[in-house]
A protein has these predicted regions:
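Class I SAM-dependent methyltransferase Rossmann-like catalytic core
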Residues: 1-14
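Flexible, glycine/small-residue-enriched loop-and-beta-strand segment within the central core
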Residues: 3, 20-104
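Short, intrinsically disordered, charge-balanced linker/junction segments flanking boundaries
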Residues: 106-110
Length: 110
């Protein structure tokens, strides 16, 4: 068992005291704008994943990342995108293999 806010790899995230996991979550981040905040006394099961952005633009004519794969598309901005920060309240249990996407808020005690 490890307290996440005591592990250097999680220092850039806002993680409350006594939040723990057996192995720690996987966190994917495509920029420093989308934040992850996890409250105190949370329990994270194994293989939990937080995805901070990196989402395809379903509102565009294509979800293909032309700007990332072709020099001709380098001028296209807004892809990948984020729906906002991830906020997890206090005393929350996140179960095995859960995947939490950007823009999600989980309330206290969930």
């Amino acid at each position: 068992m490890l307290y996440l806010n005591q592990k250097p790899e999680y220092n850039k995230y806002d993680i409350g005291d006594y939040t723990y996991s057996k192995v720690g979550p996987t966190i994917f981040s495509w920029n420093d704008e989308t934040k992850l905040k996890i409250g105190k006394f949370c329990s994270l099961a194994e293989e939990v994943v937080f995805i901070l952005g990196g989402e395809h633009r379903a509102d565009w004519i294509t979800t293909y990342p032309f700007n990332a794969l072709f020099d001709e598309g380098a001028h296209i901005t807004g892809h990948p995108s984020s729906k906002g920060d991830i906020v997890v309240g206090n005393d929350v249990w996140i179960g095995y293999q859960s995947c939490i996407l950007s823009g999600v808020t989980i309330g206290n005690g969930a």
